[in-house]
Amino acid sequence: MSNAVQQIIEQDNTTKLSLPPVINPITEAFIDRNPDMIFDLVDAFGSPLNLIFPQMIDRNIAAFKEVYKKNNLSGQIYFTSKPNKSVSIMRQASTNDVNIDVSSEKALHTVLSCGFRPERIECTGPKNLDYLSLAVQQGVTINADNLTELQQAIEIKKSLGLQEKLRVFVRLSGFNSPRVKFTSQDGTFGVHVNKAPEIFAFLKANIEDLDFQGFAYYWSSASEEQRIVALENALELTSEAIEQGLNPKGLNIGG
């Protein structure tokens, strides 16, 4: 435990802690070196006061990569910007071997200014024309919620006279299995898996404009059984996409 934290606990007789707080070593070192400064900052800016240590993202990314290494896995890690809006953290993340996903036009502008090159950015979420236009102009990967978004992206690409294919994922929803129960609220984003024939037909019809990266899905449920079914369904469609000659590059299991 940090010496400064220990002193505060000992001075406050009303504080009864059964367990010491778990403090990151970087944070602990800062507290030990600057115990008075912390109180000065609270006096100046008020409470609650959030102090950010951007360099901690390096440790987190390294921990993720270690999981890949231990399990002989390959893949690309994505930092998600929606719940992590600190520009300083995004800038630090850009110095690591990670990509990033965004869910709005404003967020896309932000991550571009933080040092992420377009090939490291993926656009998710509902996309109006302004958001979609910026994504197409910058050449970032588009994670489409529906075929309408893809059609609009193609039209924007052609109107701008762009020759390079658009990198796209197609987000799936509506997963099903006889052994697991799903509700209509589960997996509300994406194209229903029952519409797979329409997806394949669209992708093949627009193969000159779209570079199909693969399928994606977002799953917020804590149910391990549902997550397994979602992965199974997505892998089945990935295999079918290969048979259809679409050459998917991977599977996005995060968004």
Each language-model region and where it sits:
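A charged N-terminal "starter" segment
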Residues: 1-158, 162-166, 207, 243
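Active-site loop/helix belt of alpha/beta enzymes
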Residues: 2-5, 11, 175-255
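A cross-domain feature marking catalytic cores of carbohydrate-active enzymes
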Residues: 79-81, 102, 125, 144-146, ...
